[in-house]
Amino acid sequence: DGRVLTRDKVLKGSKKGDAVIILPITKEKNTVLVIQARPNVKEGVSVELPAGYVEDNETKEEAARRELKEETGSVTNQLILLGEFYQDQGISSAYNSSFLALDCQKKYSQMLDKDEFIRYYECKFEEALELLEKGYIKDLQSQYTLEKAKTLVKKGTLIQYK
């Protein structure tokens, strides 16, 4: 009808702001969460999954492997795409990809950016789900990734964790 829309657009990370979220599962069938300083949240810290931006020169799979290594010191030979979603399509074109990383092995020390304060925490998958259900995991991208993995486990289409 000829109307012009004006919208704000938030730019984060790389030019597009695309990000990856990784649910690491170790060879012992544990998962790895990160506890990260988050000054913008009420609690000041957040329990979440390893995550980060896709750099301009890499694929989402390469970004997932890099972030896993940087935040936890772990590597994986098997990445499974769990799903993709827009982070906040009202203000951003950022497109996030959630991965399951199987048979993770800790081989390195963390390689954090100078503005990152992250500790990792290894626990049973069921404990991670309990933290989610009790409201300790509050970021939507970690919630989404854990719920997608939980659905696959219930359907029997994913490795058994017990």
For the regions a language model picked out, list residue spans one by one:
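Short connector loops/turns at beta-strand edges and beta->alpha or beta->beta junctions
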Residues: A37-N40, C104
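Beta-strand scaffold of nucleotide-dependent catalytic cores
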Residues: I21, V32-Q36
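Unchanged
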Residues: D18-I21, T26, G52-L140, I159-Y161
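A short acidic/small-residue loop/turn micro-motif
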Residues: K12-G13, P39-V41
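A conserved beta-turn-beta hairpin within the catalytic core of GNAT-like acetyltransferases
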Residues: V41-V47
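Charged phosphate-binding loop/patch that engages nucleotide di/tri-phosphates or the phosphate backbone
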Residues: Q143-K162
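Acidic, metal-coordinating catalytic segment for phosphate/diphosphate chemistry
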Residues: D1-L23, K27
